[in-house]
Amino acid sequence: VEFSVAEEALSTATQEIREGWMQCGLACLAQEGTAATLTTAITDVKEDIIATRQEIVEDKGRANVVMCTPAFYSQVLLAAGKDFTPVMNDRIASTGNVGQWLGMTFVEANGAQGSIKYYDSTGAQKTVDMSTVQYVMYYHEALSVISNFEVARVIDSERFAGSLAQVEMNTGYKVTNTALARVRKVAGG
């Protein structure tokens, strides 16, 4: 494989790792965060978000990030209308999946579906069912992410003539204060 092809494969692998890293963080928040009181279908997006935020504030916390499923993020965009402010930087401008509303950063988590596996702070692998999760609201310092090994490289392959793209990462996740993270689920899917 030519170096340019391996470089492209490395870029793709890095993107996949980035997506997996986000999925694992979201799974940790969903697993270790506190369940929001409301579990009924969401009919008023703004009211629902404010109610969940109120739960965190009443627990002496604050919230500034909302990780949303794509379906809920669409509801946020419709509800917020012109009040939704996209976050501007090169990566965000190309995806359009992060913005500000109600004093919080909303992130569209494309991988927030099905079952997600992650390693918790003890090194145990957990599987989290995301089928009923609509969003996770939290304070950005409530999620600890610690990586103890990262490598991304293009190397000569020992299996064939050419180059091989390799990306590896070992990361642990922990919600350090469950009062600062609320998981909004809808009962029964």
Each model region followed by its residue ranges:
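Short amphipathic alpha-helical segments, especially helix-boundary/capping motifs
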Residues: 25, 50, 138-139
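Sequence/fold signature of self-assembling virion shell proteins
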Residues: 82-189
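Long, contiguous amphipathic alpha-helices that act as assembly "spine/axial" helices in icosahedral shell
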Residues: 1-34, 57-61, 65-67, 106, ...
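Extended, solvent-exposed, turn-rich assembly/linker loops in the middle of proteins
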Residues: 30-100
